[in-house]
């Protein structure tokens, strides 16, 4: 179903001319729900749930379903749907063999809480390759890219077909500003402005963002669509509850009422850089915007496993600019602004007078020098409301959650070092939970074997529990072989870069074999144990661990004190860490 927009609209038409509407009409809803209750059902992921909501309301117009093979292949290769329409990101529904889908049949789609969302007629089932998609769409096979690591765990088959949406995913927070594209357009219409400048954000807004957006709407003589993402963003981002409180405070106090519309977007970001920026432009057009502010490294995931950025700083701006005639959305560049303290104003870097005194605070400094140390951000950098909200929601680093992940071969010394470190952290005032790989297998992962699939499941279970501990401000130490790089990166992505410390216990195989307290290596050499890491199954060492330990040169206590000193240097523990009797702290 597609709905007409109002003929007299002053706003740009939706992408493709009309907004898709997949909602079952109210008159048919009871019958459709009764029918759905008789169908087999599958639970879809949080990402697919976000995508379904965006499809249902027309945010992905002209797309009206999870992509079939023809659309998927062409989008992957050419950034276009099968009919030639520009569309840069694949929107797919991965399924597994266990879902037991049959072509031509109907299936009910449910979310993670088992709430009934939609009926899908299975019209296509087709194979896809996560590595190929990572390379062609996101320019990477590196599991340090969060979507690449995530896709490796998706099913190898995609399903597609007609969707009849019975209800949108339930939201109980900020319901007054959760608006569909049609609802957003209606509010924008009331402002009387034909030009709409959209600002995509997944971070708190500071004075520089306020200044930038005000300049943009003045330049375009338009209204600002402040459109923060509240679906899935980059792991480790400030939670959306905190961010939205900031946005609401700024919108209410520092913008003219008819010059801003704050609306939340339930988008699951891919952190896909230039392709994602183009996708954002299409989504914002469907919400009524004809301009999009695009910053440096827009939707970038950070650095790869070799410490290099996945995308160039201006790739996203160039992509949106290149296709502006097709999307109908102009690119407004996010110019870098500096504060001039002597004049109490912001100015573009290129226009700062020679010799003028300037001030700036980087994102890293915000986290480490201010929030991480319990200091309020200065008024020239953030509005008082923003500074107070962030201070309330973002405790000093020594009170933040933390995961210390020990990885290495069996017998490397992970558990021994972790046991010493636990006492040092307790001494420093940290409350610590230890998740040891051997112990976990007798409880949380009881019944799992040692196939690659089972090993991944074991590590992901440990990671999930650890992420919940971290989310609630606790400290957790995990000691597990965790041989596969992609799986470790997936666990890192559950917590974010700042709260995950990967410790590589770099003990050579021959040393581990000499220790062999459990006799496991001897059994593996005799062929009595299959798929044993280091013997018949590979161990993939970390490429850029936060800490690397040498257990041949240093004792477990020395290595534990090295880790504790590293944590103290970065503010994770407050009290000074005593050095060992020989004065050793660092390798």
Give the positions of each predicted feature.
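Active-site cores that bind ATP or allylic diphosphates and position pyrophosphate for catalysis
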Residues: 2-398
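Glycine-rich phosphate-binding loop of ATP-dependent small-molecule kinases
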Residues: 68, 74, 80, 191, ...
